[in-house]
Amino acid sequence: LKLMLLGIKKGWFPPLPETGNKRSMIHVDDLVRAILLVAGDDRANGEIYIATDGTLHSSRDIYNVMCNALDRSIPKWSVPKFLFDMAALISPRIKYKVDKLLGDECYSSGKLEKLGFKAQKTLKDMNETDF
C-alpha cells in the first residue's frame, strides 16, 4: 500500500482496473480500539483476533480513496487487467506482486465482534497518513 500511495503521489502508479477483488482494511483508530478492547477482556486471553472494518473493498476502491486522500483526480480510465496478467508471466516475482495487488485478501472480524467490537471508520475516512 505504501508503494501504491507513493506512486500515486508521484504520478507513476497506473490506474487499477475494477476486478471485483475483495480486500479487508481497517482504520488505525479502529485497530487501536480493538487492541484496547481485547487487552481489557478476560475472554480474549490466549485468543487470536482479526480486526477489519467489516466491509470488503476492491483494489480499485483503495486506489480511488488514495487519490482522494492525496487530492488527485481519479482517472476515468484504467490499465486493462490482461496487461497485468501478461506482466505476471514474466517472472514469479512480478506474478507475486500482481497477485498481491489484484487478488483477494479478505478476513472476518466476527470473533472480535462477539466481544463488542464494531469499526467506526470506513475506508473513505482514511487520509494519506493512515496508509
Can you say where each PLM-predicted feature lies in the sequence?
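Substrate-positioning beta->alpha
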Residues: 1-3, 16-39, 46-47
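Residues in well-ordered alpha-helical elements
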Residues: 2, 29-32, 60-61, 110, ...
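Short, hinge-like loop/turn segments at secondary-structure boundaries
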Residues: 3-7, 93-96
